[in-house]
Amino acid sequence: LKQTNPALFEAITRETVVWYTGQFYALFFLERMVKVDGFTANTLVAMALLIGTPFFIFFGWLSDKVGRKPIIMAGCALAALTYFPLFNALTEAANPALAHAQRTAPVIVSAQGDTCSVQFDPIGRNRYDQEGCDIATAYLARAGVNYATEPAAIGADALVRIGDQTLTAPTARRLPEAERARAIAAFHGELRAALDAHGYPPAADPARINKPLVVAILALLVIYVTMVYGPIAAMLVELFPTRIRYTSMSLPYHIGNGWFGGFLPTTAFAIVAATGNIYNGLWYPVVVAAFTLVFGLLFLPETSKRNIDA
C-alpha cells in the first residue's frame, strides 16, 4: 500500500480526471449543457478523437526521449489552466444563442437556503421534486442556464426571475400527491416559455454551430488526454518491482478510474446545480489536476531510465 499511494494520488488520479473531462465530460457538456443534438455531438467528438488519437503514440515515444514526468506534468498543468476558457469557447462555438442569452438575460433564483439540496445522485435514485428551489434549479441546470441565487424570506416560495418576469416555483410537498406532477409540469412549461422569450434556445441551432472550431477545441482536449495517458502505462510498469507489479498497478488503476473518474459527471452536475453556473462543474477536474500536479512535482519520481526487470 505504501508503494501504491504515489501512483494512485498522482499518476492515476490525474490521468483519470483529464481523460474523463477531455472525452466523456466534453460530450456530456455538449449534449446536456450546450444542447447540441446527440448525433451531431457524437460526430464532432469522434472527429476530434480521430485527430487526437495519434498523439497517444507521439507522447509515448516522446516520453522515451525526455522522460515520463515532464510530459505528464505539462498535460496536467495545461488542463488546469485552460479548461475554463476552452469550455467557455465551446459554448460560444456550439450554441452562440445560449452564450448571448447568458450575458444579456441573467436568471436569479430566490429561495430559502435550507430548501435547496445538493443534487449529488450517483446512482440516479433521488428525486428532487419536493421543494420549489430543487424543482427550479434542477430544470435550469439541465437546460444549460446559468443562474444566480439569493436568499428569500422564511416561508416564502421559491421564485425565478428572468429579466422583468417572475415565476413562482411550486412547493410540491405541500400539494396532494395527485397534483404534484401536474404542478411541476405546468411550472416547467412556464419556465421554458420565459426562457424562450428571453433568448434561451431549447436546443443548439445546427446551422449556427461552428463545427471546425468545436472540433479544434475538442481535439485540444483529447491532446491533453494523450499527454497524461500516453506515458502512463510505461510509468506504472516502471514504478513497481517485478514481484508486486501487477497487484500494485491494478489497485491504483481501478480505484483511480472508478472513483475519481467515474464520479466526475455526477459530481460536476451537482456542482452546477448547487452554484448555478454551467462551468463550475469544471472545478472538480481543475482542483484534482492542480493538486496532483503539485503532489507529482514533489513526490513522483522519474521512471524512464529504471530497469523494469528488477
Which positions does each model-derived feature cover?
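Helix-to-loop junctions at the C-terminal end of transmembrane segments
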Residues: 56-66
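A membrane-interface helix-boundary motif in multi-pass transporters
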Residues: 37, 191, 195-209, 272-287
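Interfacial helix-cap and linker-helix signal at transmembrane-aqueous boundaries
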Residues: 31, 62-63, 267-276
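Cytoplasmic membrane-interface "Motif A"-like loop-to-helix N-cap segments
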Residues: 65-76
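Low-complexity, proline/glycine-enriched hydrophobic segments characteristic of transmembrane helices
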Residues: 88-216
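A late C-terminal transmembrane helix in Major Facilitator Superfamily
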Residues: 243-274
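Multi-pass alpha-helical transporter architecture, strongest
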Residues: 82-93, 288-310
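Extracytoplasmic gate region of multi-pass secondary transporters
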Residues: 2-51, 87, 114-150, 161, ...
